[in-house]
From Swiss-Prot:
Gene Ontology CC annotation, any one: cytoplasm
Listed name of the protein: Serine/arginine (SR)-type shuttling mRNA binding protein
Record carries keyword Nucleus: yes
Alphabetized InterPro entries for the sequence: Nucleotide-bd_a/b_plait_sf, RBD_domain_sf, RRM_dom, RRT5_SRSF_SR
Basic and acidic residues bias (residue ranges): 12-23, 42-66
Induction profile: Increased in the filamentous form induced by acid pH. Increased during thermal and cold stress.
Gene coding for it: RRM75
MF terms in GO: mRNA binding; RNA binding
GO biological process: nuclear mRNA surveillance; poly(A)+ mRNA export from nucleus
SMART domains named among the record's database cross-references: RRM
Keyword terms, alphabetized: Nucleus, Repeat, RNA-binding
Role according to the record: Binds to intron-containing transcripts and is involved in quality control for the export of spliced mRNAs from the nucleus. Binds to pre-mRNAs until splicing is completed or until faulty mRNAs are degraded.
Superkingdom of this protein's organism: Eukaryota
Length: 596
């Protein structure tokens, strides 16, 4: 067996863009690949050990969280200076656990080893020297042979044969301990291209927006990514890819600052001060107590809260640990504003039986020296329901408007009219505002947005007592404006523009403001009615920031510049605005929104 000789004269090394995040991260602790110093070599025996001196000393690498953040921001700044709009693509509908490196690997979708037809004497290519050394070592152990020739791997670009005219190729290879001789030309799979930078967009509190930006080395590669990567699965979600429509790049950390939101309301009581009183005053006795494992949307619960986790546990570790209990659809680690773990996480199963098994198996389980707390997640996002569906802990009988299920009477509390009580639309409860009066989407969480005879989101009215249910309002006439409800409290005007410009041209977008804080809803105006219809069809019930959005055409035309239509912000043409005075706020009679 003759070994393929490496012809240095016929070798052309691939250019590495100097603002590729992979190249710039060599001085960061995240990097794992050594820097190749001198002439490339495919064998450890031929490697000059003096090349190690060119590497950055490990002691000089940033180790603290702040140092790594500064290094990451510096890399983003350098990439922004050389970024080209026609090379960038926007990737939407990402899972909230996707990080920039996962996104980059997905959009690149190429393995480190690129194999060509060796019958004409061409040499296979590895992405870097480290991969080449590993492959050559594996080749010696496994005896990778093709047509009587021993495969030899080298870094850089090799001319000759089928590899001469391709930039990024890969071959589907069966996993085996020994490759048989090739009797036919290997099948070549083209990838989208070379990714030079990727970033997942985040909210001010550090959580993912579910979208990101990826930049390729050439416009042709970006267009190829749009054609080939759209509707592909990434961590259980079909992503969509389009060109980036922003003239200015958005690389770098999102602007910080505390998320907007109000204080916590009480646990019931007729004046919202919190009470465990009789049914007429709300509180926990406003309705029947919640069952031990009550769910949302009337279905069995599937999402678990995992507490007392070690702070170094990643979402991959969490998913691997709980995988034995059943099919996991999502696993997340709760992160603080500083990017560090809070020591807790969320695991969602596809089946409620699997969730019950996980509680039985892992509650009290010792993991890395800690006893885990495993229970049902009480704050799991509820799926959209029909206008009269019960989505709380149980049916809402007539009782306190606070508490876990009252219909009317008290104020505030953990639900009642909206929240954990009547769910998404009981006639006597809250929900999506199909009731006579009361704060929609949760009395306990400060009302939410848009009630019938109450404040247009955020506050509940003082009236209490039985009343007849109003019929659901007819759908609004199509227009260029849409009304978006159940937004995260930290959502800004710019976030609205970024979210909805994926479906069409956005002329204006504003968050509804009341009392100096967000009401959890907003108005978006498109250039055409068709764009507005597309946005409703695409983003209604879309989970954004952990909340399912409720979108419809705006019933009353909003003039922008007044806090997102604070005068016209009510989403029902028959709902008058109810102003909450400062005195009411001081007395505690008017519950204020709480950050969800």
């Amino acid at each position: 067996m003759s070994e393929v000789e490496y012809n240095q004269e016929n070798t052309h090394y691939a250019e590495v863009d100097n603002f590729d995040r992979d190249a710039m991260s060599q001085t960061r602790a995240r990097s794992r690949s050594p820097v190749a110093g001198g002439a490339p070599s495919s064998d450890r025996r031929d490697r000059d050990r003096t090349d190690r001196t060119d590497r950055t000393d490990r002691s000089d690498r940033p180790r603290s969280f702040n140092d790594r953040a500064i290094a990451s921001q510096h890399a983003a700044t350098q990439a922004s200076r050389k970024s080209q709009k026609n090379c960038r693509v926007y990737v939407g509908n990402l899972s909230y656990g996707v990080k920039w490196n996962t996104l980059k690997d997905f959009m690149r979708e190429a393995v480190d080893v690129l194999l060509g037809d060796t019958r004409d004497g061409s040499i296979t290519r590895a992405r870097n020297a480290s991969a080449a050394r590993w492959l050559n070592e594996s080749r010696r152990q496994c005896g990778w042979i093709a047509d009587g020739k021993v495969l030899r791997f080298c870094p850089g670009w090799v001319t000759g044969g089928i590899l001469q005219h391709l930039n990024h190729v890969r071959v589907a290879i069966q996993h085996s301990t020994r490759f048989p001789s090739f009797h036919r030309q290997p099948s070549i799979v083209y990838t989208a291209g070379h990714v030079v930078f990727s970033e997942v967009l985040t909210l001010p509190n550090g959580s993912s927006k579910g979208c990101g930006i990826v930049e390729y080395s050439t416009p042709e590669e970006a267009q190829k990514a749009i054609r080939e990567m759209t509707n592909k699965q990434l961590e259980g979600r079909q992503v969509f890819v389009r060109e980036d429509r922003e003239d200015e790049v958005r690389y770098g950390t999102s602007p910080g600052g505390p998320p907007r939101g109000g204080g916590r309301g009480g646990l019931g009581g007729s004046s919202g001060r919190g009470s465990f009183g009789p049914p007429v005053r709300g509180g926990f006795y406003g309705g029947p107590p919640p069952p031990p494992y009550g769910g949302f949307g009337g279905g069995a619960p599937t999402q678990l809260f995992i507490g007392n986790l070690p702070f170094d546990v990643s979402w991959q570790d969490l998913k691997d640990l709980f995988r034995s209990a059943g099919n996991i659809t999502r696993a997340d680690i709760n992160m603080g504003h500083d990017g560090r773990s809070k020591g807790s996480g969320i695991v969602a199963y596809a089946d409620s039986n699997d969730a019950s098994n996980a509680i039985a198996m892992y509650h009290g389980y010792e993991f890395r020296g800690r006893m885990l707390e495993v229970r049902l997640d009480k704050f799991a996002s509820a799926p959209p329901m029909d206008p009269y569906g019960r989505a709380g802990y149980g049916p809402p009988p007539r009782g306190g408007r606070g508490g876990f299920g009252g219909a009317y009477g008290g104020r505030g509390g953990y639900g009642g009219r909206g929240g954990y009580g009547s769910g998404y639309g009981d006639p006597y409860g809250g929900g999506y505002s199909h009731e006579a009066y009361g704060g929609a989407y949760g009395g306990g969480y400060g009302g939410g947005y848009g009630d019938r005879h109450g404040a247009a989101g955020g506050y509940s009215t003082r009236a209490s007592g039985p009343t007849s249910a109003r019929a659901p309002a007819p759908p609004a006439a199509p227009s260029q404006q849409i009304f978006v409800k159940n937004l995260p409290w930290s959502t800004s005007n710019e976030d609205l523009v970024e979210l909805f410009q994926t479906t069409g041209k956005v002329d204006e977008a504003e968050i509804v403001i009341g009392g100096g804080r967000s009401k959890g809803c907003g108005v978006v105006q498109f250039a055409t009615v068709e764009d507005a219809e597309t946005a409703i069809a695409k983003f209604n019930n879309y989970v954004y920031g952990g909340r399912p959005l409720d979108i419809e055409f705006n019933r009353r035309w909003t003039k922008f510049g007044t806090g997102g239509g604070s005068v016209n912000g009510g989403n029902d043409g028959n709902a008058p605005m109810v102003e909450v005075s400062a005195q009411d706020d001081e007395d505690g009679d008017a519950p204020v929104p709480m950050q969800g």
